Amino acid sequence: MNFEIPEGLTDLLQDFTVAVLREKPSDLVEFASSYFAKLQENNISLGGKRGVTFTAPEDAESDIDDEPPELPKNRYARRKSVCAEKYDPEADNDTDTQKLVYPKSDEQRARLTEAVKNILLFRALDEKQMQEVIDAMFEKKTTPGDHVIDQGDDGDNFYVIDRGEYDIFVNDNKVGAYKDSGSFGELALMYNTPRAATIAATTDGILWALDRVSFRRIVLKNAAKKRRIYEELLEKVSIFKSLEPYERMNLADALVTRTYEDGDCIIAQGDGADGCYFIEAGQCRIAMKSERSDNPDEEKEVAIYNQGQYFGELALLTNKPRAASVYAVEDVDCLLDVNAFERLLGPCMDIMKRNIEHYEQETSRLFGK
C-alpha cells in the first residue's frame, strides 16, 4: 500500500516535536491541543495557511475559499507579523557579529545576575557566556498600562523581569500574571512566530531586554552546541545504545556541566544520592573504605573511569547511601540530577539494575564481604 506524504507534514511534526522536548509537558494530549490551537490562531491572524496539503489532480477543482474570513479587531494588535526565515543554530557559522555591551553599575549587574540565575534557557551557558548575556541586556522601565509586547507582533526582544507586575492577555482574555520575577518573549525569537500573547504592565516596573540577534547568537547557538556535545557523549555510553535519537536529545537537554579540579571529591561514600554522573572529559578515580580495615578511614582504589563512562546510578536505583567515593583525576564531568534520571531513564533501568549484581560481586572480591 502506497501512502502520499502531504507537503508540510514533516516540518509541522518537527516543530511540534521541538516544542514538546523543550517544554516537557506532563500531559502530552493537552499540550498538543493547545499547541495546534495556537498555531491555527496564528495562521488565521496572518491571513494564510500553515499546514499540510496533498497534491490534487490537475482536473480537480478546489472548493476552498481563497479569501480568509474577516476577523474581529484585536484592541491589542498594533501590526501583523511577517515572519522571517527560521533560525537554524546548527547552520550559523557567523563569528563576526559585533557583541553589544550596555554599561551597568555594580548594583544593576547584581540585580540582573539575581534575576537571570534561575532561567532555564540560560542553564546551558557557561560563566563567560552568562557574562555576555548580562553585558548585552539593557534596562527598560515600565509604567502602568504600558504594553511590553502585543499579540501578533514581531518578536524583537527577550525580557526578564527585575521588578513590577505584568498581566498576560490572549485574545483580550487575561490568562495569567507575573509579579517581580519571570521571563517572556523567547518563543517568538526561537521559532520566528508572532507574539502569542500581550504583556501589559499594571505597576511601575523594570525589565531587562535582550535583542533578537544577541539572543540567538548567545543563547540558541550555544545551547545547540552544548546539546551536540552531550549527544555525542551519550552515544558513547553503552546503556544508551537502545535509546531513540529524540530520547537521547531529551536526555542531553537534562545534563548540566560541573567542572572539578584534580583531587576534588565528586561524591563521598555514605552520602545521599544527588545524581548520576557521566564523564565528559578527563578521568575519575573510584575508591572504597572497608569495614574490615584496621583504619576505618583508609580507602582502596577499585577502578579508574574515563570519558563516556558513568557512575552514581546504583545509589539512585537502590535508594541507599553512596557505596564509594569518586575523585577527579582531571577536569570535567556532567551531572544528570535525580529527578531527570528517574523521569528520562526508564528504558535503561533494567540494564542499570544488572550492574547491582556486578557491584556486589566486585565488593566481595575486594573486601571478602
Swiss-Prot record:
3',5'-cyclic AMP 1 binds at residues 121-238. It comes from the Eukaryota. GO terms for molecular function: cAMP binding; cAMP-dependent protein kinase inhibitor activity; protein kinase A catalytic subunit binding. Residues 1-120 are annotated as: Dimerization and phosphorylation. The keyword Transcription regulation does not apply. The modification Phosphoserine is found at S81. One of its GO terms (biological process) is adenylate cyclase-activating G protein-coupled receptor signaling pathway. Pfam families: cNMP_binding (PF00027), RIIa (PF02197). Residues 56-79 are annotated as: Disordered. The keyword Phosphoprotein applies. One of its GO terms (cellular component) is cytosol. Keywords: cAMP, cAMP-binding, Nucleotide-binding, Phosphoprotein, Repeat. Residues 58-69 have a biased composition (Acidic residues). 3',5'-cyclic AMP 2 binds at residues 239-365. Tetramer, composed of 2 regulatory (R) and 2 catalytic (C) subunits. In the presence of cAMP it dissociates into 2 active monomeric C subunits and an R dimer. Belongs to the cAMP-dependent kinase regulatory chain family. This is cAMP-dependent protein kinase type II regulatory subunit.
